[in-house]
C-alpha cells in the first residue's frame, strides 16, 4: 500500500490502534458449524491465490477470508455457490480496503482457472445480488479488524538495535527487519489457513506472529518490554497461539523435507531454539516464500539442506514456551495495567469438527520443543 495508507507511521497510530482494539471486541461470534467446513481450507487458499494474482493488500485478503468464514458459519452452501461467495467476499473486501483501480474486474474473475474448470460464469447481476446478501448478513458493516490490520503496527517495534541475536549484537538492523517482516507474513498466512485461529482476538494473533518470528530468528529478549507495552499482551497470553503457529511451521518444514527426500536423521537436527551465546560466527541466508499452485501454502525455508549444518549444536539449550523469557519476567511486573486478558479474545470457542482437513497432524502439547530452521546473521 502507498504511504498515505500506512497509518502505523503517522501521529495518530496509537489512537487508530486503540480504535481497532475496541472494534475487535464487537466482532461477530464464530462457531465453526458450517456443513462445508471441510472445504474451508480450499476456499481460503483460493482467496489467497486470487488476491496475489491481483496484488491485493493483506488486509483485503484477510478480510475476505473472514467474511467467508462468517457467511459459511450461517448458511448451507453448495460447492458451486461457494466459488461465487468466495469471490464476492474478495470483491467486497477489495472495494473496502483497496483503491478503485485495484479492484478485480468481472471479466478478470471469469478468466480465472478455477472458474473455467468448474464451467462457472459470473454475471454482473449475480455478483450484485450476492454482494447485497453479504452486506445484509453483516448489517452493512465491513469494518471488521483482522490480524493483518494490526501486524504492521506491531512490526514497527518488532526489531530494535538493542536486540541480540544468539546473544550477539546485530550487525545489520535493516536486514533483520526485512526477515522479521517475511516471517511475520508467513505466520499471518498460517493463521489464515486454520479456522481455529478465530478463537483468538485478531490483535493477539498478530502479536503472536511477531513473537513467533522473533523465536525463529533467535532474537532476545523474545518478548521485550516495548512489545508488551505496544500490544498490551504479556507473554503468558500469547503462548498458546504461538505454539499453534510454531507447530504449523514445524509441519511445513517436515513436509518440505519429505518432498525433497531428505532422510530422518537430517530432519531431526532442527529441534532446538538457541538461547545461549554462540561460540563461533554464523552466517545469514535468505529464506524463500512460495505459494504452491496446489492451494497449499508451504514454508520452503527448509528447502536449502545446507542450512541444517550451519548452526552449531555445541552451544544450544532448549527453549520452553511455558515460561517467561529470561530477564523479561521481572521487567514487566509493573505493567499489569496493560494486560487485556480474556476480554480481548472472542467470546465463543471454536468447535472442532471431525470433517475438518487441517494442516496439523500432532496433538497440542504445552511443553513441546518446536523444531525450526533459523536464518543466521553475518559477523
From Swiss-Prot:
Origin, by domain of life? Eukaryota
> Gene3D superfamilies, alphabetically?
Cyclin-like
List the keywords (alphabetical): Cyclin
- Keyword flag Metal-binding: no
Task: Tell me the CDD domains matching this sequence.
Answer: CYCLIN_CCNJ-like_rpt1, CYCLIN_CCNJ-like_rpt2
Recorded hits in InterPro entries, A to Z, give: Cyclin, Cyclin-like_dom, Cyclin-like_sf, Cyclin_C-dom, Cyclin_N
Q: Tell me where in this chain the Cyclin N-terminal domain is found.
A: 15-143
Q: Per the similarity annotation, which family is this?
A: Belongs to the cyclin family. Cyclin J subfamily.
What name is this protein filed under? Cyclin-J
Q: Which organism is it from?
A: Mus musculus (Mouse)
Amino acid at each position: 500500500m502507498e504511504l498515505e495508507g500506512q497509518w502505523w507511521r503517522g501521529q495518530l497510530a496509537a489512537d487508530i490502534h486503540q480504535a481497532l482494539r475496541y472494534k475487535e471486541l464487537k466482532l461477530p461470534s464464530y462457531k465453526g458449524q458450517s456443513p462445508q467446513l471441510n472445504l474451508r481450507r480450499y476456499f481460503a487458499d483460493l482467496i489467497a491465490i486470487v488476491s496475489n494474482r491481483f496484488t491485493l493488500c493483506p488486509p483485503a485478503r484477510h478480510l475476505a477470508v473472514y467474511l467467508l468464514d462468517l457467511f459459511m458459519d450461517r448458511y448451507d452452501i453448495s460447492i458451486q455457490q461457494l466459488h461465487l461467495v468466495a469471490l464476492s467476499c474478495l470483491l467486497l473486501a477489495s472495494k473496502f480496503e483497496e483503491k478503485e483501480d485495484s479492484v478485480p474486474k468481472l471479466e478478470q474473475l471469469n478468466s480465472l482457472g478455477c472458474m473455467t474448470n468448474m464451467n462457472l460464469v459470473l454475471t454482473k447481476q449475480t455478483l450484485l445480488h450476492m454482494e447485497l446478501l453479504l452486506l445484509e448478513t453483516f448489517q452493512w458493516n465491513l469494518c471488521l479488524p483482522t490480524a493483518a490490520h494490526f501486524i504492521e503496527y506491531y512490526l514497527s517495534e518488532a526489531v530494535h538495535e538493542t536486540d541480540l541475536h544468539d546473544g550477539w549484537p546485530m550487525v545489520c538492523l535493516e536486514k533483520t527487519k526485512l526477515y522479521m517482516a517475511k516471517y511475520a507474513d508467513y505466520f499471518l498466512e498460517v493463521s489464515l489457513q486454520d479456522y481455529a485461529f478465530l478463537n483468538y482476538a485478531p490483535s493477539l494473533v498478530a502479536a503472536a506472529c511477531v513473537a513467533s518470528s522473533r523465536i525463529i530468528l533467535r532474537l532476545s529478549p523474545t518478548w521485550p518490554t516495548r512489545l508488551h507495552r505496544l500490544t498490551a499482551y504479556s507473554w503468558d497470553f500469547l503462548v498458546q497461539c504461538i505454539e499453534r503457529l510454531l507447530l504449523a511451521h514445524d509441519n511445513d518444514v517436515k513436509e518440505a523435507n519429505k518432498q525433497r527426500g531428505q532422510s530422518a536423521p537430517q530432519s531431526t537436527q532442527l529441534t532446538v531454539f538457541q538461547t545461549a551465546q554462540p561460540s563461533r560466527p554464523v552466517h545469514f541466508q535468505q529464506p524463500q516464500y512460495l505459494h504452491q499452485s496446489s492451494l497449499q501454502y508451504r514454508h520452503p525455508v527448509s528447502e536449502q539442506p545446507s542450512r541444517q549444518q550451519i548452526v552449531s549444536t555445541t552451544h544450544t539449550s532448549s527453549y520452553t514456551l511455558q515460561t517467561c523469557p529470561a530477564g523479561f519476567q521481572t521487567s514487566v511486573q509493573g505493567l499489569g495495567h496493560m494486560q487485556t486478558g480474556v476480554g480481548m479474545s472472542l467470546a465463543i470457542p471454536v468447535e472442532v469438527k471431525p470433517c475438518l482437513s487441517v494442516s496439523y497432524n500432532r496433538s497440542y502439547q504445552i511443553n513441546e520443543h518446536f523444531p525450526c530452521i533459523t536464518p543466521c546473521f553475518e559477523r
